[in-house]
């Protein structure tokens, strides 16, 4: 019997809420999958669509079922929603351009533009500060509400001439933005080697030097020992509330009397609790901002 040698792609679609985006992107990168895109509708901020293109000869039925079940299980760890999924057979589509066409130039605030690395700068955004990112590297392109809150805060409070520390750097977008908004230097750190690799790649994409933005693999304790006695003027940490609580005892060691904290990854409902927790450690709330049930808080040391 002659077996078919037809080559095609499986296109997988999954509608999901924004708060699990970074977990999904982490999973895709761990699986070595780079041909994916996320489609967002301005009319529905609560749902977005993940699209993944998989070569048929590498992804048999059992592999596709395992792939889908893994994503659904990952979502269930965060919330109970049943996600809508779809598989489609794509024969004539050029996947190398198909997944890329869904990524667009993404304006943030009034000054910043997130630009996928393969796109030309649109004339309409020629006056913006451009941050080039590779969506296929890891951790997305700064589209999560908490990342946008941090970018907007950096724009409101540009770190001119300041030393910045980015704890849990992900793609490196916040450190890159800090440099492009005038920071003297940024030290970024993450416990995930994928994040360190992604940040390193994005540093190169943006023509920055290691002297301007350096990234290392390790814990906040490692960084505190490396930086001492060099203190940061601004400490950025975009992660979950329980993680912030674990890291908070090190914030004093990384900063000085007039430093500022920029903390996000928090739900609006968690702001009061985390603010009270940090107050006990000597930090005072300056401002808070919110978007789509997510929040950012800015703090300074509580001087008697």
UniProtKB/Swiss-Prot annotation:
Identify this protein by name: Ribosomal protein L11 methyltransferase
Provide this UniProt record's keywords sorted from A to Z. Answer: Cytoplasm, Methyltransferase, S-adenosyl-L-methionine, Transferase
Query: Where does the UniProt annotation locate this protein?
Result: Cytoplasm
Its ancestry begins with: Bacteria, Bacillati, Cyanobacteriota, Cyanophyceae, Synechococcales
Q: Which GO terms describe its cellular component?
A: cytoplasm
Pfam families cross-referenced by the UniProt entry: PrmA
Top EC class for this record: transferase
Query: What EC designation does it have?
Result: 2.1.1.-
Native source species: Prochlorococcus marinus (strain SARG / CCMP1375 / SS120)
The answer on whether this UniProt entry bears the keyword RNA-binding reads: no
For the ligand (S-adenosyl-L-methionine), the binding residues are: 147, 168, 190, 238
| BP term (GO), one | methylation
The job of this chain, per UniProt, is described as: Methylates ribosomal protein L11.
- Entry's family note: Belongs to the methyltransferase superfamily. PrmA family.
Q: Which PANTHER family match?
A: ELECTRON TRANSFER FLAVOPROTEIN BETA SUBUNIT LYSINE METHYLTRANSFERASE
Swiss-Prot/TrEMBL catalytic activity: L-lysyl-[protein] + 3 S-adenosyl-L-methionine = N(6),N(6),N(6)-trimethyl-L-lysyl-[protein] + 3 S-adenosyl-L-homocysteine + 3 H(+)
Molecular function GO terms recorded: protein-lysine N-methyltransferase activity
Q: Does the keyword Cytoplasm apply?
A: yes
InterPro entries attached here?
Ribosomal_L11_MeTrfase_PrmA, Ribosomal_PrmA_MeTrfase, SAM-dependent_MTases_sf
The portions of this protein that span the membrane are: none
Q: What is its main location?
A: cytoplasm
């Amino acid at each position: 019997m002659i077996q078919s040698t037809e080559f095609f792609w499986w296109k997988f679609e999954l509608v999901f809420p924004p708060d699990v985006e970074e977990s999904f992107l982490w999973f895709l990168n761990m699986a070595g999958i780079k041909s994916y895109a996320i489609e967002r509708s301005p009319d529905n901020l609560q749902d977005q669509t993940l699209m993944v293109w998989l070569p048929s000869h590498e992804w048999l039925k059992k592999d596709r079922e395992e792939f889908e079940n893994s994503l659904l299980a990952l979502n269930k760890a965060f919330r109970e929603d049943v996600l809508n999924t779809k598989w489609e057979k794509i024969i004539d589509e050029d996947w190398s351009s198909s997944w890329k066409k869904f990524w667009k130039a993404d304006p943030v605030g009034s000054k910043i533009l997130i630009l996928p690395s393969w796109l030309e700068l649109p004339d309409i955004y020629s006056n913006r500060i451009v941050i080039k990112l590779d969506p296929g590297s890891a951790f997305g392109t700064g589209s999560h509400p908490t990342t946008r809150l941090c970018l907007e805060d950096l724009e409101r409070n540009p770190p001119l001439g300041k030393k910045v520390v980015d704890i849990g750097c992900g793609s490196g977008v916040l450190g890159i933005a800090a440099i492009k908004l005038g920071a003297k230097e940024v030290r970024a750190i993450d416990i995930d080697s994928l994040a360190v690799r992604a940040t390193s790649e994005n540093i190169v994409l943006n023509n920055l030097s290691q002297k301007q933005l350096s990234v290392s693999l390790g814990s906040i304790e490692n960084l505190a020992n490396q930086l001492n006695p060099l203190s940061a003027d601004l400490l950025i940490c975009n992660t979950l509330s329980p993680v912030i609580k674990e890291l908070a005892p090190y914030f004093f060691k990384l900063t000085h009397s007039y430093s500022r904290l920029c903390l996000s990854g928090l739900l609006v409902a968690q702001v009061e609790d985390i603010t009270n927790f940090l107050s006990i450690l000597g930090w005072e709330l300056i401002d808070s901002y919110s978007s789509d049930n997510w929040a950012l808080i800015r703090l300074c040391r509580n001087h008697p």
